[in-house]
Amino acid sequence: MKIAIDAMGGDHAPKEIVLGAMKAVQHFSDVHITLFGDEGKIRPYLTSDERITVIHTNEVIEATDEPVRAVRRKKQSSMVLMAEEVKEGRADACISAGNTGALMAAGLFVVGRIAGIDRPALAPTLPTIGGEGFLFLDVGANVDARPEHLLQYALMGAVYAEKVRGIPRPRIGLLNVGTEDQKGNDVAKKAFQLLRETDLNFIGNVEARDLLHGVADVVVTDGFTGNVALKTIEGTAISVFSMLKEALTSSFLSKLAAAILKPKLIDLKKTMDYSEYGGAALFGLNAPVVKAHGSSDANAIFHAVRQAREMVANDIITTIKEAIEQNHS
């Protein structure tokens, strides 16, 4: 199995990308990785090149670049070359922690969209209090969505939850402003009807306040709403941990309490760290494309490789194509 990685994408590239790639090949004996980027910057961190190939390029798509223009003009960038590797069949999947918009553009223009999919969706797996996690899509690939798009998101999400996460008959929820059947705007109401008519295990509308309680295994929404919800969850988690840290270091007694609570706090932080689930998969393309978080460290890259490997091993793309074809028939 071959996985292509953009070694120059992300806040900590190429060091953490390279370290994560080495950890992955040590852990997975069937994985071969191709790193794309500045070889002079990659090699100092590559202490072992067993099953790792480096393809040199100086060109990089920066975080500040306009996504579509960058993909079209920077043909020799590490990200575009990575996507080309998948398109030409020399790699089975690809991963980047770089510019999200550019990766989505490279996915569409280079890797290509599955026939029958109107719009791809960006789908991270987020943590829940019970530790099960839930798949959330779309979180920003498309700010607007029609009812049929939300149905396609649900079909793709159900395949991933079942095949990769091992959840039989995953519960599908539609993010809404209330749980009643007739809640929401026109798009939500029509999407509700479409989802109810499928063979999916559709549990109805779910509210944002219940997401981290594991109310559903897959939650679908438009990219604008999904991105706002995702950033709210991220920001709240960061703020809560900051407040806890301040409260537990404000006095001698609180520091004693912190020492006692430290193992539990570490466990809690690990539970809420969604890098453990891998990156955000870009569903609807002809091959697995994984967007790792921009601040990914080596461990996050390792989990992104694990995720991509599982998507390839479980032939997710073929199953998604079959689900879409069946829905159209």
Curated annotation (Swiss-Prot):
InterPro entries: FA_synthesis (IPR003664), Phospholipid_synth_PlsX-like (IPR012281). Pathway: Lipid metabolism; phospholipid metabolism. GO terms for biological process: fatty acid biosynthetic process; phospholipid biosynthetic process. Its main location: cytoplasm. GO terms for molecular function: phosphate:acyl-[acyl carrier protein] acyltransferase activity. Keywords: Cytoplasm, Lipid biosynthesis, Lipid metabolism, Phospholipid biosynthesis, Phospholipid metabolism, Transferase. Pfam families: FA_synthesis (PF02504). GO terms for cellular component: cytoplasm. HAMAP family: PlsX (MF_00019). Belongs to the PlsX family. This is Phosphate acyltransferase.
